Amino acid sequence: MKRHGILNSQISKVLADLGHTDTIVIADCGLPIPAGVARIDLALELGTPSFVDVVRIVADDMAVEQVTLATEIKAANPVALEAVMKLDVPQDYVSHEAFKELTKQAKVIIRTGEATPYANVILHAGVIF
């Protein structure tokens, strides 16, 4: 058994396999998941686990170079936006429709139980050196 970091074996494997600029998505429970994109479904009930918790834990174990968010998060979900801003990496904003198109390129979408609007982020992998 691991002593530190993410215990979920699927997420641990995805993070270990990422290369520079690869992307993963952390999503609320309503974001459509495109055909062909791997899904790790953590949702247990509405709100559990939260977007904020999953972002914090995954980002602590991942070299994040940049994030992409839907522009709509700025007005609709300041709590989720604040959680992402704490990562202290450059942010790119696109429309929600463009965001959904970008998810088609992700290595995986991690679905949380979050049930608030636009609580979705694309994490771009950096390097550890």
From Swiss-Prot:
It comes from the Bacteria. The active site is at residue 20. Keywords: Carbohydrate metabolism, Cytoplasm, Isomerase. The keyword Isomerase applies. InterPro entries: D-ribose_pyranase (IPR023064), RbsD-like_sf (IPR023750), RbsD_FucU (IPR007721). GO terms for biological process: D-ribose catabolic process. The keyword tRNA processing does not apply. Substrate binds at residues 28, 96, 118-120. Pathway: Carbohydrate metabolism; D-ribose degradation; D-ribose 5-phosphate from beta-D-ribopyranose: step 1/2. One of its GO terms (cellular component) is cytosol. One of its GO terms (molecular function) is intramolecular lyase activity. It catalyses: beta-D-ribopyranose = beta-D-ribofuranose. It is an enzyme of class 5 (isomerase). It is found in: Cytoplasm. Belongs to the RbsD / FucU family. RbsD subfamily. Catalyzes the interconversion of beta-pyran and beta-furan forms of D-ribose. Homodecamer. PANTHER family: D-RIBOSE PYRANASE (PTHR37831:SF1). This is D-ribose pyranase.
